Amino acid sequence: MENKVLFTDSVVANFCKATVDDNPIHDPEFMYSQNKGVVVPGMLLFSTIVNLLHRKTKEYFNYYKLIFGNVICTNEPIDLGFETKGEQNYLYAINGHDMFSTKNDRSVVMRNIEYKEFHPDGIVRTMPFHKTQLETFRELTNSFNNTLSDFLFTIAYASAALFKAIREPITEVETEINRLLNKAINPDQVSPFYQTLEIFRVNQHAELKFEGIIEYKIRFDREKANKTYVAQVACVHNNQCFYQSVYRLVAIPDKLIMRMVKDR
């Protein structure tokens, strides 16, 4: 099932405000100054598709695997949807190329998948939120219901928690990533890019209060120094675990990221 969708600059700006996403590739003013299009956040695309999937199937899914293979810009029509093959629901966002696939793998949503064993340690980063953020998020992602929307919001908000950990490092690995991404220190000018994200939904009934704190227990591990890292994240609110997730991040040159983005 697919929809033709077009995301405007204002939608992206409001989504980033709600999720505290300050990545400059989503900033119209900055990107236009570079004669580049504005990149639509992957979590905006993902959340929109998942709402569509749940609205169509009315099923509960506990496993989400995202593959990030491309970027999509605002003000361009996108084929957005999912393709069901047996127990697997493949997600896609296509505008010439699919954002959610590579030559070797595709983003998929499934149910009844066993959880992985997670490291019990990690450092908790707290992220405050308020009602306006949730309402904006629900509106922009065409929310199916509040419970699903809260789950998706906590995923989108996790990016801000990860970058908070990097900007305010505590562990040796966090300090290493901080130095790598600090453009005042590292002349190579690199930025983090998600390669994959696996999410194991723990509680299908967990909901956010109107305002409060979301706790993200984060553990960074080095896969290849100054290149590739893995982050394990557990998301908790009001003593309820929403999900556990595994990110694989790679540091790539800013120039390469900009080459992936269409010219205006």
Language-model regions: role of each:
Residues 13, 18-21, 31-32, 45-46, ...:
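A generic structural micro-environment signature
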Residues 1-38, 110-172:
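Catalytic strand-loop segment that frames the active site of acyl-thioester-processing enzymes
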Residues 21, 26-29, 53, 57, ...:
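General "foldedness" signal
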Residues 16, 20-26, 45, 147-228, ...:
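Acidic/His-leaning functional-site neighborhoods
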Residues 1-3, 58-63, 67-133, 201-264:
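HotDog/MaoC-like acyl-thioester-processing domains
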Residues 49-57, 82, 141, 158-166, ...:
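Hydrophobic, Leu/Ile/Phe/Ala-enriched alpha-helical segments that form helix-helix packing faces
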Residues 34-74, 174-198:
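Extended, compositionally biased flexible segments
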